[in-house]
Curated annotation (Swiss-Prot):
The gene is HAP1. SMART domains: Fungal_trans, GAL4. It comes from Saccharomyces cerevisiae (strain JAY291) (Baker's yeast). Residues 1-50, 162-176, 432-447, 706-734, 1388-1411 have a biased composition (Polar residues). Residues 177-208, 735-759 have a biased composition (Low complexity). Binds DNA as a homodimer. Interacts with SRO9 and YDJ1. In the absence of heme, binds to at least four cellular proteins, including YDJ1 and SRO9, forming a high-molecular-weight complex (HMC) which results in repression of its activity and dictates its DNA-binding specificity. SUPFAM superfamilies: Leucine zipper domain, Zn2/Cys6 DNA-binding domain. Keywords: Activator, Coiled coil, DNA-binding, Heme, Iron, Metal-binding, Nucleus, Repeat, Transcription, Transcription regulation, Zinc. Zn(2+) 1 binds at residues 64, 67, 74, 81. GO terms for molecular function: DNA-binding transcription activator activity, RNA polymerase II-specific; RNA polymerase II cis-regulatory region sequence-specific DNA binding; zinc ion binding. Heme is an effector molecule for CYP1/HAP1. The repeat region (see FT table) mediates heme induction by masking the DNA-binding domain in the absence of inducer. Zn(2+) 2 binds at residues 64, 81, 84, 93. This is Heme-responsive zinc finger transcription factor HAP1.
Length: 1483
């Protein structure tokens, strides 16, 4: 582990402790022997035959643990000796506490408490002096009152301590005098500083001017994810919440969702109004059994009514289809797929999700996006032999199938309605209700065993003996199990250190008889023979003598599975090309001999051959532990071992995400990996917390003296190799956890009688066992506290264990009196617990100000600035973690009730090393003294070989990433707050740019660290050995978060200023032809120059916001590299699929069009020549759903907002030409706050010049006519009247649709009506119904031939606004429709209006003579007219890729169509009663 220099002075506590240690050593002889925790315990009385046993000196050593381990002389200096300092392990120098020093320790605690109080008073006085020196009285009021209230948080407690601990008026007066002196000195220093600060007065005044600004984070960064089965709240720290506070992302999503609606309308018009020559059933009934009885009682499972809405049937000239795999004779009358209006909803027996494995028919170039019914077109079915499976969902089929036929075994087809004999090259699979996702597959070098027990059905009840017999087949051989356990405790144990190593190994010996191979070897109790007979010795019997052994067996299975997944050879191969060399860190293989490397390679190759299947864990937790019942119903069998298993289970679910679907029944529709963002972990952690409360873990074990009385009975049970009959006088909770520790202590004592159990264990060993049990108790509790903090940080949810010290007095594991000389790695674990808890306190301080509603509603800028500065000092190593926590408490940013007053014996030298020292440890391979001196070669030779040092440094690496992610989040919040204020207050521009640059620096830091991790996981003996599974998701999540900010900056760099609500249009209608040749040539030159610079770009350097035009290209190159990384990681990790889709989504969207338009073809060649309709499997399903599905997407909800169906606003007067319907006239919807116009921090003069040139070229191209809408004048509007909407059709014309209306007047393409004109009178963004449209019931072409003829000649977008059930005659609809300034749809029925029958498409009037089958709507024109977003030209082909296409809602849950945004396609359960009950928010 790397050490960093700390310029910390030796505290007074250490000097007092040192003087205490220097007392006469004769004081030891009168103390109680053994490591007793009580000072008044009786001395040890020897038995009558004690003279025959050699007496041992029961004293506590004075030398430090490290010197005793190295067997060198210790000078006993405090806080660390010189020997440890010279060898570079001063941070591990540890002294066991003396029993006679307990009273002195209490005095030290009092003095330390007084010292902390003095520091707080000093900080308060300093703050008050600054307030009084402020020239503004307003700032005094606004600053003094809230600050004092925060600073004195918990002051009553400290005041009581002061009164209790001083004890005399003289000490209080003395302290008062010291405070006065310190105050005078500080005033003099402040006066001298003020004289030297005149040069920086301007910058300081700007900073001080906005210090008291309040931010309301409860509205800007909160999301509510509405799902089909409930709602989930996502706080400000969730990865989805970043877009809510950014106006650019809001408007971009609004544009994307609006485009998605328009593109669906285009597809609808293309397919709905073509003549259907034939409507044949796609199933060939000729192959069905011609049984008369069957024909009379059974029907075809295809819903033929679907063809009436535009579905094209197979043509007659198509080749003969294959035999239908559906056996129609097996369908009863109740198996027909239900219509939408049927009351009894019986699901279709065909499992459509199975088509993703190769049975999906190829899609047409223009599928019908509004078709939600399942069609089976066997003419286009392509069976993939290696992947084809039975398409029947047996769970839905067996529910409605007759029991007499289901139980029949004579006819194989009676069990499954599929005639498998007709499925060519497809093997029938046995029916199983256990659908699993393939978990991590072994790499090329691994050969997993195929267990027959994996193929058996697990849905039926299994007895305990059957489960144990099955597990014996699944578990690896004994020697392999021992190797896995050793690997776990060597590499993975520091990540979840809640076990007692010796205790756990002893349990495994009892259950699996591992020591029977050779009981005369290492501390595990078994040898590692190379003989093949011993190597392949299987597990023949599993002994479960106690009830808790089932939990120990479950922990073992998790350890076997997790360690196998973490083997470096099993990690994903990452090849980023030339950029890979930039992210490599030095490894430590040079420190190992060739023989050691060879031995390690042999062990890994042996372990790779023995994979423990995930089904073994399912069997254990379901039938042996019955964890579902324990965690939800009863706590009768809850003990420490149960809590340990629950923690391991939670840890495994988060780490091995590909196994998650096998273990849980979570509905993961629309989420790539529910294991990290779903509510399942929240429920499990709450259960773990309640079980910990039930076991009393929140109270320190020293409060329960009855723990000492259970050891003799426990040891007797263990020595007898215990049956399940426990001593009724003992505590069963302790029996299950302390027994093995006692036995292990007996085996280490060297006494044969103790090992055999014939004599009771002596008191010293009992005391050691008690202390180890208490130590495990404390470790479990503080690990739960850390889990709570991490979950709150990941999901943005409130913490469960708030104000920890108000209900818990459990001490840190460092308070345990254990001799670590035999277990140095446990000493490192103890040090890490203290350090990580202090880091968690820093994270808690941030979470309180962001997530707590009482603080987040009015958090002030200077509070966030203080958090930023302290976190920067911590991660850059300029301040020790103890000092950072003390500063947080003194400044009122962290209440003492959160646990700020940690134990007084914290090691100031054991802190968080610098990130550079962690990464470069293998290269320099040297440490520094505490005073900064380099170590010599002789000191390096004497350095102690520390266990799992690389794992500890990897954990330090993850802590740095977490802290810097918080710094990025805080800077991003302040940036999005001050950037829109620049147009009104220019002084905020400096602040906004500073915060943006800081946010970008920390985002790039997280991006680099993510790349460093994945580029080094497969290196031998690297920093991340065996940590590839545990740290993969945290690192990838931080990299994904940083890319979100990259998207924000690219939008600003490409779009320029937002035009706001009172100027020109936000979303313009420029096309590709709007660019003149000179501007495009200049763009090409700039792009070529930027590409040359990118070739020399160093990904390890920070990006400057002043990079100008190359900023977007630099950031885009990083997005492309991250997309390449996630694509490779998707092969192994499911959660990488979501991130790959997210990155690919924005890469496709933000790419600049690379092809110039052809003026001869009218711009139609703007599309790529080889463009084809993208495959449905590549679409983003959250954009392919219908409107009801999108309303459940949190991004959609926050980008557009919820409103009533008619889009009426509460309190707004009815405008001319607008009619209000029903209750919407009195019931308003939720509207988003208005967005003000402002210039982004990336705005430069070159952006202005290029935008002006673009605007001029666009103005030259336009042709004005009577239908043109002047954006600068709301009065120049054609006259018209408002048609009466009917059947839910809003009278408000949707945004982005007027271009198709204006195409009716001569084919010209004017600009889109200004968003300002639509919303200026309402003061808000356009509502949901103004941007999207309700689904329209279009007329049947067979009913009205004349109407169909007119529709054929309309543009595809125009016909989207015609309603079949309207009461207005079609002749009255043949008028000019436009949008006025109020957003009202107007119809001109004057004589000058042109009729629909005479309208032409943009391609000319010659299309009117074409037939319906020959006419094809012009998709390219449509895309070009909608590819401009605020000056950002979006590639039309990319636009189709990200918003086009249509996914069947039944396929949204497939693995290959997983989305990066959550969306559901089922109604919200429990809210059906509120439908249309004046609750527009649920509409």
């Amino acid at each position: 582990m790397s050490n960093t220099p700390y310029n910390s002075s030796v505290p007074s506590i250490a000097s007092m402790t040192q003087s205490s240690v220097s007392r006469s050593p004769n004081m030891h002889t009168a103390t109680t022997p053994g490591a007793n925790t009580s000072s008044n315990s009786p001395p040890l009385h020897m038995s009558s035959d004690s003279s025959k046993i050699k007496r041992k000196r029961n004293r506590i050593p004075l030398s430090c643990t490290i010197c005793r381990k190295r067997k060198v002389k210790c000078d006993k200096l405090r806080p660390h000796c010189q020997q440890c300092t010279k060898t570079g392990v001063a941070h591990l120098c540890h002294y066991m506490e003396q029993t006679w020093a307990e009273e002195a320790e209490k005095e030290l605690l009092k003095d330390n408490e007084l010292k902390k109080l003095r520091e707080r008073v000093k900080s308060l006085e300093k703050t008050l002096s600054k307030v009084h020196s402020s020239p503004s009285s307003n700032s005094l009021k606004s600053y003094n009152i809230p600050e004092s209230s925060n600073l004195f948080m918990g002051s009553d407690e400290h005041t009581t301590l002061v009164n209790a601990n001083t004890g005399s008026a003289s000490s209080a007066s003395h302290m008062h005098q010291q405070q006065q002196q310190q105050q005078q000195q500080e005033q003099q220093q402040d006066f001298s500083r003020s004289a030297n600060a005149n040069a920086n007065s301007s910058s300081l005044s700007i900073s001080n001017k906005y210090d008291n600004d309040e931010l309301d984070l409860t509205k800007d960064f909160d999301l509510l994810h509405i799902k089909s089965n409930g709602t989930i709240h996502l706080g400000a720290t969730h990865w989805l919440s970043i877009m809510k506070g950014d106006p650019y992302l809001k408007l971009l999503w609004g544009h994307i969702f609006a485009m998605r609606e328009k593109l669906n309308e285009w597809y609808y018009q293309k397919n709905s109004y073509s003549k259907l020559k034939s409507s044949k059933c796609p199933i060939n009934h000729a192959q069905a059994p011609p049984s008369a009885a069957a024909a009379a009682t059974r029907k075809c499972p295809v819903d033929h009514s679907a063809f009436s809405s535009g579905m094209v049937a197979p043509k007659e000239e198509t080749p003969l289809p294959r035999k239908c795999p559906v056996d129609h004779t097996m369908f009863s009358s109740g198996m027909i797929p239900p219509r939408e209006d049927t009351s009894s909803q019986k699901r279709c027996p065909v499992d459509h999700t199975m088509y993703s494995a190769g049975m999906m028919p190829p899609k047409d170039e223009t599928p019908s996006p509004f078709s939600t019914k399942a069609m089976i077109d066997h003419n286009k079915h392509t069976m993939n032999p290696p992947q084809s499976k039975c398409p029947v969902d047996h769970r839905n089929y067996m529910k409605d199938y007759p029991s007499d036929m289901a139980n029949s075994s004579s006819n194989p087809a009676s069990r499954c309605p599929i005639d498998h004999s007709s499925m060519k090259n497809t093997a029938a699979l046995p029916a199983s209700t256990h659908n699993t996702i393939p978990h991590h597959q072994p790499q090329s070098g691994s050969h997993a065993r195929s267990h027959p027990a994996q193929n058996r059905k697990h849905d039926s009840y299994m007895t305990e003996s059957e489960v144990l017999a099955t597990l014996c087949e699944m578990l690896p051989p004994k020697r392999v199990i021992a190797l896995f356990i050793e690997k776990f405790f060597k590499h993975l144990y520091p990540a979840i250190p809640i076990l007692d190593e010796q205790n756990f190994k002893n349990h495994m010996n009892q259950m699996l008889s591992l020591s029977s191979m050779n009981p005369t070897v290492n501390n595990f109790g078994m040898s590692m023979p190379s003989s093949s007979t011993l190597e392949n010795q299987p597990i023949t019997q599993i002994n479960l003598p106690k009830l808790s052994d089932s939990c120990n067996l479950g922990i073992l299975i998790i350890i076997l599975r997790l360690t196998w997944l973490s083997i470096p050879s099993n990690s994903c191969e990452v090849d980023l090309g030339e950029e890979s060399g930039s992210f490599l860190v030095p490894n430590e293989s040079s420190n190992m001999s060739a023989s050691a490397l060879t031995s390690m390679a042999k062990e890994e190759s042996l372990l790779l051959k023995h994979e423990t299947p995930v089904e073994a864990l399912e069997l254990c937790q379901k039938y042996l532990i019955k964890f579902d019942e324990l965690s939800s119903i009863s706590n009768n069998n809850v003990n420490l071992t149960t809590v340990q298993f629950a923690i391991f289970y939670n840890f495994y679910m988060k780490s091995a995400s590909n196994d998650l679907t096998t273990l849980t029944n979570t509905n993961n529709t629309g989420m790539a990996n529910p294991g990290h963002d779903s509510e399942s972990h929240q429920i499990l952690l709450s259960n773990i917390t309640q079980m910990a409360f039930s076991c009393g873990l929140h109270r320190d074990p020293d409060n329960f003296p009855q723990l000492n009385a259970t050891i003799p009975a426990t040891s007797q049970d263990v020595s007898n190799n215990g049956s399940k009959k426990a001593n009724p006088s003992t505590n069963p909770t302790l029996n299950n956890n302390m027994s093995a520790a006692t036995t292990n202590s007996s085996s280490r004592s060297g006494s044969a009688d103790s090992r055999s159990g014939s004599n009771p264990v002596n008191k010293k060993e009992n005391q050691v066992s008690i202390e180890r049990f208490k130590h495990t108790w404390r470790k479990i509790w503080y690990y739960i506290v850390s889990m709570d903090v991490n979950q709150s940080l990941s999901l943005g949810s409130p913490r469960l264990l708030r104000n920890l010290r108000e209900f818990s007095d459990t001490k840190l594991p460092s308070a345990s009196r254990i001799d670590y000389v035999r277990d140095i790695k446990e000493l490192i674990i103890v040090k890490n617990f203290t350090l990580f808890f202090q880091i968690d306190l820093c994270i808690i301080a941030v979470l309180n100000h962001i997530l707590n509603v009482s603080l987040a509603r009015s958090v002030r800028k200077f509070e966030l600035d203080s958090l930023i500065n302290l976190l920067k000092n911590l991660t850059y190593g300029t301040e020790n973690v103890n000092d950072v926590v003390s500063s947080l408490i003194n400044k009122g940013l962290l209440p003492t009730s959160e646990g700020g007053s940690v134990d007084s014996n914290n090691d100031e030298i054991y802190g968080l090393p610098k990130l550079t020292d962690i990464l470069n440890h293998g290269q320099h391979n040297q440490n520094l003294y505490a005073d900064g001196r380099n170590t010599s070669s002789s000191d390096i030779d004497k350095k102690l070989d520390l266990p799992h040092e690389s794992t500890t440094r990897a954990l330090f690496f993850s802590k740095h990433m977490t802290i810097r992610m918080l710094l990025y989040l805080l800077n991003y919040i302040l940036f999005t707050h001050y950037e829109p204020m620049g147009s009104e207050d220019p002084g905020t521009n400096i602040l906004a740019k500073e915060y943006a640059q800081e946010a970008l620096n920390f985002a790039m830091d997280g991006y680099r660290n993510c790349m460093i991790f994945f580029n080094n996981i497969r290196n031998t003996n690297s920093l991340f050995d065996y940590m590839n599974v545990i740290l993969s998701y945290p690192c990838l999540d931080i990299g994904h978060r940083s890319l979100q900010f990259i998207v924000c900056l690219i939008l600003r760099a490409k779009c320029g200023p937002l035009t706001g609500m009172r100027e020109s249009s936000i979303i313009t209608n420029g096309t590709s032809s709007g660019f003149n040749s000179s501007v495009e040539d200049e763009d090409v030159k700039v792009k070529q120059e930027s590409s040359d610079e990118l070739k020399k770009d160093d990904f390890m350097k920070d990006v400057n916001l002043d990079s100008g035009d190359s900023l977007a290209e630099i950031l885009m190159s990083r997005m492309l590299l991250f997309q390449k990384l996630t694509k490779q990681l998707s092969k192994k990790y499911n959660y990488a699929i979501r991130m790959n889709k997210s990155t690919g989504f924005f890469v496709s969207l933000l790419n600049t069009p690379s092809k110039k338009p052809d003026s001869k073809s009218g711009g139609s060649s703007f599309m790529l020549g080889n463009w084809k309709h993208p495959k449905v499997s590549n679409m983003s399903g959250f954009l392919a759903g219908d409107k009801d599905q999108l309303q459940k997407c949190p991004v959609y909800q926050d980008a557009l907002g919820f409103v009533s169906p008619t889009g009426a606003n509460e309190g707004s007067a009815p405008m001319q030409g607008m009619s209000l319907q029903g209750s919407t006239a009195r019931m308003g919807g939720t509207q988003l706050p208005p967005i003000r116009s402002y210039k982004p921090i990336t705005y430069t003069s070159s952006n202005l010049r290029r935008m002006n040139e673009t605007g001029e070229a666009e103005a030259k191209r336009r042709r004005f006519n009577d239908g043109y809408i002047d954006n600068n004048s709301n009065n120049d509007i054609p006259r018209g009247i408002s048609p009466k909407p009917s059947n839910g059709l809003s009278s408000v014309q949707p945004l982005l649709s007027s271009f198709s209306m204006n195409q009716l007047y001569g084919g010209t393409i004017p600009t889109v009506p200004s968003l300002t004109n639509i919303t200026s009178q309402m003061g808000a963004l356009p509502s949901l119904d103004r941007i999207t449209t309700n689904q329209i019931n279009l007329p049947d072409p067979s009913r009205d031939e004349a109407f169909d003829n007119s529709i054929k000649q309309m543009t595809p977008m125009t016909s989207a606004f015609m309603n079949a059930n309207t009461t207005i005659p079609s002749s009255t609809l043949n008028g000019n429709m436009n949008m006025n300034g109020a957003g009202t749809a107007n119809t001109d029925t004057s004589a000058n209006g042109s009729a629909l029958s005479t309208l032409t498409s943009p391609q000319g009037s010659d299309l009117a003579s074409n037939s319906a089958t020959q006419y094809k709507p012009d998709l390219e024109d449509f895309l070009m007219q909608n590819s401009n977003f605020n000056g950002l030209m979006i590639n039309p082909s990319s636009l189709v890729e990200v918003v086009g296409g249509y996914n069947d809602p039944n396929n949204l849950g497939r693995n290959d169509a997983v989305d990066f945004l959550p969306v559901d396609n089922v109604e919200i359960d429990g809210l059906v009663d509120f439908y249309r009950a004046d609750f527009p928010i649920w509409e």
